[in-house]
């Protein structure tokens, strides 16, 4: 909904896209639990066929439902075509549908960053970098709308750099979310990551999950603690 709103689509179109997204995910709920609990690397070719069959069965049921509006069916059909091209019912060449492109970007971003059984989720930074790098696969306008919706590198966010240092986002970059102005904790200097000279030596690797506020405590001193005041010299 946020992506479609950022793209300026009319309200009815936004509702149709949300409805199509929910109907698409019904197919995912039909996937057997033993397959859903597998790590991605352990998914077999037979498992892939069963997964596709679940989405296909769901798609066919909704396609024949006379209560659904033609617009929702069109978005759902196009979404199945771009997300599950191996499904026979969606194999026919279809014109580009903006709703399907939105669902494609949202589905892939959610899939990469969501918690999964046995698999570590990608960070939002890694997911965004993947979407931006695969311009031939994902609509750039839709990816930009996603970035404008989630604000992952807003001022105040602590980040890790590729050179091993940590820092703080000072000013966001509307042109490229991965290239804001940052403050390096190492030398207390400001850096413009949009500057190619700076980018050659440091880029944003990931967002820091938490600031570590733990204190280092001497273990021998800790053993002496009995609830009374200790003279530390």
What are these regions (language model features)?
Residues 1-233:
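Histidine- and acidic-residue-rich, metal-dependent catalytic cores
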């Amino acid at each position: 909904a946020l992506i479609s709103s950022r793209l300026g689509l009319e309200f009815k179109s936004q509702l149709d896209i949300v409805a199509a997204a929910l109907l698409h995910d019904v197919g995912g709920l039909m996937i057997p639990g033993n397959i859903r609990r597998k790590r991605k690397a352990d998914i077999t070719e037979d498992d892939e066929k069963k997964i596709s069959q679940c989405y296909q069965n769901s798609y066919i049921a909704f396609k024949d439902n006379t209560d659904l509006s033609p617009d929702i069916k069109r978005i759902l059909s196009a979404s199945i075509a771009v997300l599950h091209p191996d499904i026979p019912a969606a194999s026919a060449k279809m014109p580009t549908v903006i709703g399907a492109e939105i669902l494609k970007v949202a589905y892939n971003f959610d899939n990469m960053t969501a918690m999964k059984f046995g698999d570590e989720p990608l960070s939002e930074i890694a997911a965004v970098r993947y979407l931006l790098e695969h311009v031939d696969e994902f609509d750039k306008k839709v990816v930009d709308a996603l970035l404008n919706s989630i604000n992952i590198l807003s001022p105040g966010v602590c980040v890790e750099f590729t050179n091993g240092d940590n820092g703080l986002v000072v000013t966001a970059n509307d042109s490229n979310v991965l290239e804001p102005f940052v403050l390096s904790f190492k030398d207390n200097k400001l850096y413009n990551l949009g500057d190619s000279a700076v980018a050659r030596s440091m880029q944003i690797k990931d967002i820091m999950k938490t600031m570590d506020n733990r204190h280092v405590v001497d273990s021998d001193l800790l053993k002496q603690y009995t609830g009374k005041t200790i003279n530390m010299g």
